[in-house]
Amino acid sequence: MEDQVGFGFRPNDEELVGHYLRNKIEGNTSRDVEVAISEVNICSYDPWNLRFQSKYKSRDAMWYFFSRRENNKGNRQSRTTVSGKWKLTGESVEVKDQWGFCSEGFRGKIGHKRVLVFLDGRYPDKTKSDWVIHEFHYDLLPEHQRTYVICRLEYKGDDADILSAYAIDPTPAFVPNMTSSAGSVVNQSRQRNSGSYNTYSEYDSANHGQQFNENSNIMQQQPLQGSFNPLLEYDFANHGGQWLSDYIDLQQQVPYLAPYENESEMIWKHVIEENFEFLVDERTSMQQHYSDHRPKKPVSGVLPDDSSDTETGSMIFEDTSSSTDSVGSSDEPGHTRIDDIPSLNIIEPLHNYKAQEQPKQQSKEKVISSQKSECEWKMAEDSIKIPPSTNTVKQSWIVLENAQWNYLKNMIIGVLLFISVISWIILVG
């Protein structure tokens, strides 16, 4: 019915104060009170944005709102908005209910109204504004119970666009780029077809729409290149191009590292590869190997760990045998050179499958590398002097020695004896 010519929400001053405002303050919010007038904070919006918060569409350039009173300065209310402030002008005007229809039979003064003019901070030299608010107060209650007022926003200018509830302000606070349709303040064709108001400010609508349009233009201006990065091709081949189909409209900006998730993991693996030989204790004497692959005859001997750089590298990442693998036997204790034990050259860890398939080729490589580093072997054997009874266990490439605990135990005993001797000397002296 409100869309029909001649119909609309046009309450007079007595109805606003005696019915709507009184019921809102007393908590008797009937259906007509809640549906007709919305509750907003007047100072949170500039007037050209405030009109969009009204529940009723108006062709009279009038919009109605409930506003809670906020006395931040004693009895004075704070009326500062984003772009300006509301200034109180003139004297208050009494609101009377002549017949008592709106105030439950009470006839006489039921309230008063005051006029406020908006001062636009964008134009400090301009003292007058086309935006006016009539603020209605209900006076039949004590001052501390008057928690709400009714504000009637009015436009006094001559701009015909303001008469439409969907129109934009002729001088918005923030002027966006109007060259693009997506950057316009309000999409008028969409709003005219909708039955609700746009509750967003013109600034937000303009900037958010423009930002989305710019992002879509960037995607269109950067098509996918004809060839992919090799790493991308690797991942595309393994994953069937699933990630590309999910993001077909987006351009890949950063190359995807297929073998590793990030660069730090690659660096860490490289460091382990280069320094793995230092992770194994150099004082290894005899090792007890729990692999199912054992030599035909039990052997014993001391096998130092640091053979050569090339041999160590092949041990770790090329799945070949290592010179550090030795077999300990309690039947024949003693020290034996690795060159005298050919069977050790084919001993591999349990998880090493390639070495077990090619024992002869790996044996030749071990013999050649052992001959090249004969001097290093002699120096290593001279530096390692550990009793044959020392047992070591190699589990997951980590060497554990019982000799270390014996050494620590002897050191502790020696310290205790030294302390006891010093104490005895002090007591005797």
From Swiss-Prot:
Bias type Low complexity, positions: 319-331
Region (Disordered): 184-210, 289-341
Subcellular location: Membrane; Nucleus
Annotated region of DNA binding: 110-162
Tissues expressed in: Expressed in roots, rosette leaves, cauline leaves, shoot apex, stems and flowers.
One term of GO molecular function: transcription cis-regulatory region binding
Membrane association type: Single-pass membrane protein
GO cellular component terms, semicolon-separated: membrane; nucleus
Domain NAC: 10-160
Transmembrane segments: 408-428
Source species, domain of life: Eukaryota
Induction (record text): By cold, drought stress and methyl methanesulfonate (MMS) treatment.
Record keyword Disulfide bond present: no
Keyword line: Activator, DNA-binding, Membrane, Nucleus, Stress response, Transcription, Transcription regulation, Transmembrane, Transmembrane helix
Family matches, as PANTHER family: NAC DOMAIN-CONTAINING PROTEIN 82-RELATED
Comment block on domains: The NAC domain includes a DNA binding domain and a dimerization domain.
Primary role: Transcriptional activator activated by proteolytic cleavage through regulated intramembrane proteolysis (RIP).
Identification of the protein by name: NAC domain-containing protein 1
